């Protein structure tokens, strides 16, 4: 595993008393009046804290879903802990950071033949499938494959982004696929599922685990000795969601004990993406243009008061693609608190491109702002930078990485000596102290001793 180099990624180590918000304010004050490009401040310490929180709440090895945010410094941080991928490019990224192939799962059930061959030539053996055609394709393109995982469909009707409409085998089809794999002498080592991104009902996991147990039993009947269960993602990554992470894990843990108890010999993994990165990234955008829409104008209903349209230097073709593809609802914040008696106006916020679709916020209340002023958007780490384009010639925002000194020291300890059996409370604030001992769990997460990646 390559070590994280703070100089390579220009990671600023925060002295005691300083926060990521201080760096963000500093960057805003540093830029000249003519150079106010949008930028991110990413707190890598927040990512590490999320990992510690995971280890306390859920006895499952996390494979970070690289597709969620593939910024190199972030992936390098998680590669020192744990990671997951879905394409040749993501495999190249994580292996370039020193992640060994045995800790990579190619978790895309629909793969291009050339990319299957690339995985084979680079030692990646663990991958998913959900159809006979995919099974045959993998058998031909990767003859030495020994570790296939059967993706099953789940009820993801309560998810923000549904996946089972595209991926997953039914229970009936699962038996047929297992029988076909046995005929081809291909080893199926386990089962995977995904309840959908942005899951809003933790009970969905219970039914999915019950279905997975059923498929495991089918595998035993067919002649397989399956030992891997992948429970996918769907975990919240910020505190502004209705369903909290611990509310989900409080439902998952009893279900795991029921269907896959610690003495079952089944290794349980997951593919969290949003959970790790959403809250770590804050985006700063600058107002580049402003339009006043007066009462009775052609642009506004006659009954309305004066409103403002603000145009900023990032939009839905850039970081805010999450609005279109991830159903995100973003809220602008101001770097400085408005005066108590300041008047608020109905406002809309637009991106910089020539497309009328490039609208970030349809309506919100803001004090009157001016060209050159800044707006902040929190919780912008998930499905933002990874899918941003340069449409119309607008460049992606720069990313400034920060980490507190205690978290930096903990990161180096993890890289040099593995995860410590105990982490001092002052290192992580209010977060958990150890991998599993503090939680009262019998099942210890394998992530305490190793790191992995979901491709």
Curated annotation (Swiss-Prot):
The protein's name: Ornithine decarboxylase
InterPro entries the UniProt entry points to: Ala_racemase/Decarboxylase_C (IPR009006), De-COase2_C (IPR022643), De-COase2_N (IPR022644), De-COase2_pyr-phos_BS (IPR022653), Orn/DAP/Arg_de-COase (IPR000183), Orn_de-COase (IPR002433), PLP-binding_barrel (IPR029066)
Residue positions binding pyridoxal 5'-phosphate: 197, 234, 271-274, 383
Positions of post-translational N6-(pyridoxal phosphate)lysine modification: 67
Chain positions found as S-nitrosocysteine: 354
Top EC group: lyase
Alphabetical keyword list: Decarboxylase, Lyase, Phosphoprotein, Polyamine biosynthesis, Pyridoxal phosphate, S-nitrosylation
Gene Ontology terms for molecular function: ornithine decarboxylase activity; protein homodimerization activity
Pfam family, one: Orn_Arg_deC_N
Family in the record: Belongs to the Orn/Lys/Arg decarboxylase class-II family.
Entry EC number(s): 4.1.1.17
Domain of life per record: Eukaryota
Modified residues (Phosphoserine): 297
Cofactor(s) required, per the database record: pyridoxal 5'-phosphate
Regulation: Inhibited by antizymes (AZs) OAZ1, OAZ2 and OAZ3 in response to polyamine levels. AZs inhibit the assembly of the functional homodimer by binding to ODC monomers. Additionally, OAZ1 targets ODC monomers for ubiquitin-independent proteolytic destruction by the 26S proteasome.
Role this protein plays: Catalyzes the first and rate-limiting step of polyamine biosynthesis that converts ornithine into putrescine, which is the precursor for the polyamines, spermidine and spermine. Polyamines are essential for cell proliferation and are implicated in cellular processes, ranging from DNA replication to apoptosis.
Catalytic reactions of this protein: L-ornithine + H(+) = putrescine + CO2
């Amino acid at each position: 595993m390559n070590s994280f180099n703070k100089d390579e990624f220009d990671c600023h180590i925060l002295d005691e008393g300083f926060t990521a918000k201080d760096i963000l304010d500093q960057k805003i004050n540093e830029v000249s009046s003519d150079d106010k490009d949008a930028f991110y401040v990413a707190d890598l310490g927040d990512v590490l804290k999320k990992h510690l929180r995971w280890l306390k709440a859920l006895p499952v090895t996390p494979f970070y879903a690289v597709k969620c945010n593939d910024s190199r410094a972030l992936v390098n941080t998680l590669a020192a802990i744990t990671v997951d991928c879905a394409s040749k490019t993501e495999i190249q990224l994580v292996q370039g950071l020193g992640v060994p192939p045995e800790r990579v799962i190619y978790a895309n059930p629909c793969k291009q033949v050339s990319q299957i061959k690339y995985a084979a030539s680079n030692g990646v053996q663990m991958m998913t499938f959900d159809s006979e055609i995919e099974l045959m394709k993998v058998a031909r393109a990767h003859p030495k494959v020994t570790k296939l995982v059967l993706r099953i469909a789940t009820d993801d009707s309560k998810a923000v982004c549904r996946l089972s409409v595209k991926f997953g085998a039914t229970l009936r089809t699962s038996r047929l696929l297992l029988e076909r794999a046995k005929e081809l002498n291909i080893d199926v080592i386990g089962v995977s599922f995904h309840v959908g991104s942005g899951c809003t009902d933790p009970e969905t996991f219970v039914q999915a685990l019950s279905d997975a147990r059923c498929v495991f039993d089918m595998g035993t009947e067919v002649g397989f000795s399956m030992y891997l269960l992948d429970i996918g993602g769907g975990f919240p990554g910020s505190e502004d969601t209705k369903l909290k992470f611990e509310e989900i894990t409080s439902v998952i843990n009893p279900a795991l004990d029921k269907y896959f108890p610690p003495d079952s010999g089944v290794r349980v993994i997951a593919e969290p993406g949003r959970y790790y990165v959403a809250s770590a990234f804050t985006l700063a955008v600058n107002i580049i243009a402003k339009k006043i829409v007066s009462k009775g104008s052609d642009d506004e209903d006659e009954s309305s008061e004066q409103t403002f349209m603000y145009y900023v230097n990032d939009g839905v073709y850039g970081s805010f693609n999450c609005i279109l593809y991830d159903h995100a609802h973003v809220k602008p914040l101001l770097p400085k608190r408005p005066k108590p008696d300041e008047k608020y106006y109905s406002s809309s916020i637009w991106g910089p491109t020539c497309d009328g679709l490039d609208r970030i916020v349809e309506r919100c209340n803001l004090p009157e702002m001016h060209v050159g002023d800044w707006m902040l958007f929190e919780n912008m780490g998930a499905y933002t930078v990874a899918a941003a384009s340069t449409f119309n010639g607008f460049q992606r925002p720069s990313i400034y990485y920060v980490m507190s000194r205690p978290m930096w020291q903990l990161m180096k300890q993890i890289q040099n000596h593995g995860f410590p059996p105990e982490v001092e409370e002052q290192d992580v604030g209010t977060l958990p102290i150890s991998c599993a001992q503090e939680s009262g769990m019998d099942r210890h997460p394998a992530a305490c001793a190793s790191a992995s990646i979901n491709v």
